[in-house]
Amino acid sequence: MCDQTFLVNVFGSCDKCFKQRALRPVFKKSQQLSYCSTCAEIMATEGLHENETLASLKSEAESLKGKLEEERAKLHDVELHQVAERVEALGQFVMKTRRTLKGHGNKVLCMDWCKDKRRIVSSSQDGKVIVWDSFTTNKEHAVTMPCTWVMACAYAPSGCAIACGGLDNKCSVYPLTFDKNENMAAKKKSVAMHTNYLSACSFTNSDMQILTASGDGTCALWDVESGQLLQSFHGHGADVLCLDLAPSETGNTFVSGGCDKKAMVWDMRSGQCVQAFETHESDINSVRYYPSGDAFASGSDDATCRLYDLRADREVAIYSKESIIFGASSVDFSLSGRLLFAGYNDYTINVWDVLKGSRVSILFGHENRVSTLRVSPDGTAFCSGSWDHTLRVWA
């Protein structure tokens, strides 16, 4: 094997042909050599012909992966519920539906809160994107998309725009105005273009950049104003279904999950995957950062939710019961991080004690599978969307 570095070339005698030429440092079996460009290319080609076949490289990758898992296992000396034994148990938990938002003509697929803690944007299989007043249940804006299955929507941090997309393979941004009679579609701005459906989108900490996830197996960071691709993220082996941006104070990272059963943490500046977790047994439908940014939760079609500690670099808790046989479609934390709300395909919302791993409540009300769920910015309520065409605000 050989690895080439990007150090500045120097002039001297080549260790291969011994001619005085511009040299580049090359590592061969961990030994540093100085080769001219011609010899370096010949050596790389010979190495590939001799033993660096695709099969051998895959074998080496699997070997390294096994060693990594062994090192992780050495650090696995305690479980979260054991540490939490001395933590006081939660008291009586009471939440119920306070508002029901009706207006979509088909399955609600996604929703997001505005930072003003009052307005909600939702998208549906009927091709509509609606902005709601969650206090009065009034519809403030409505947009008809050119395609059905609007699978992603997001509110801009300023509250002055929304983003949405789905089977049209692109992310569109609509500015919001006080004039409710204004034609919003005329001001539409197409920002992101993928080669397959758009599954999720999220503004960064400003209105100027947006993250997208797609069925083409990639995530991407875009400039909203110019529509320029700023960074692409490749690493998933199948459709990417969800993403979540880390809390602003923890740095430029985000987590994604997909049909390859992987949850991957990405550095937005370099475009590189910095951590990956593969403990789920089926598609990962939802990921959400813990409020501190030190961990994240995931919900999967394997009927479990899981908690991953980024500092320990491993899974630390599984939230499941034998009676739960349907997949988890959406997850989110309470503002304190003590509770994990999870929507399931059996029409229920389960509330989990994050520390103790126990279920503290089951919320009933939806008449079809729960497809999306988000806690309000102030933590006083959460909203769920369902295939029963409605959204419910719980408190």
Curated annotation (Swiss-Prot):
Keywords: Disease variant, Intellectual disability, Membrane, Repeat, Transducer, WD repeat. One of its GO terms (cellular component) is parallel fiber to Purkinje cell synapse. Its main location: membrane. Widely expressed. WD repeats lie at residues 103-142, 145-184, 193-234, 236-278, 279-318, 320-362, 365-394. It is found in: Membrane. The keyword Protein biosynthesis does not apply. Signal peptide: none annotated. Pfam families: WD40_Gbeta (PF25391). The keyword Nucleotide-binding does not apply. GO terms for biological process: dark adaptation; G protein-coupled dopamine receptor signaling pathway; light adaption; negative regulation of voltage-gated calcium channel activity; positive regulation of GTPase activity; signal transduction. One of its GO terms (molecular function) is protein-folding chaperone binding. Gene3D superfamilies: YVTN repeat-like/Quinoprotein amine dehydrogenase (2.130.10.10). It comes from the Eukaryota. Enhances GTPase-activating protein (GAP) activity of regulator of G protein signaling (RGS) proteins, such as RGS7 and RGS9, hence involved in the termination of the signaling initiated by the G protein coupled receptors (GPCRs) by accelerating the GTP hydrolysis on the G-alpha subunits, thereby promoting their inactivation. Increases RGS7 GTPase-activating protein (GAP) activity, thereby regulating mood and cognition. Increases RGS9 GTPase-activating protein (GAP) activity, hence contributes to the deactivation of G protein signaling initiated by D(2) dopamine receptors. It is linked to Lodder-Merla syndrome, type 1, with impaired intellectual development and cardiac arrhythmia: An autosomal recessive multisystem disorder characterized by delayed psychomotor development, severe intellectual disability with poor or absent speech, and bradycardia and/or cardiac sinus arrhythmias. Additional features include visual abnormalities, seizures, hypotonia, and gastric reflux. PANTHER family: GUANINE NUCLEOTIDE-BINDING PROTEIN BETA G PROTEIN BETA. Component of a complex composed of RGS9 (isoform RGS9-1), GNB5 and RGS9BP; within this complex, the presence of GNB5 stabilizes both itself and RGS9 and increases RGS9 GTPase-activating protein (GAP) activity. Interacts with RGS7, forming the RGS7-GNB5 complex; within this complex, the presence of GNB5 increases RGS7 GTPase-activating protein (GAP) activity. Interacts with GPR158; promotes the GTPase activator activity of the RGS7-GNB5 complex in absence of glycine, in contrast GTPase activator activity of the RGS7-GNB5 complex is inhibited in presence of glycine. Interacts with RGS6. Belongs to the WD repeat G protein beta family. This is Guanine nucleotide-binding protein subunit beta-5.
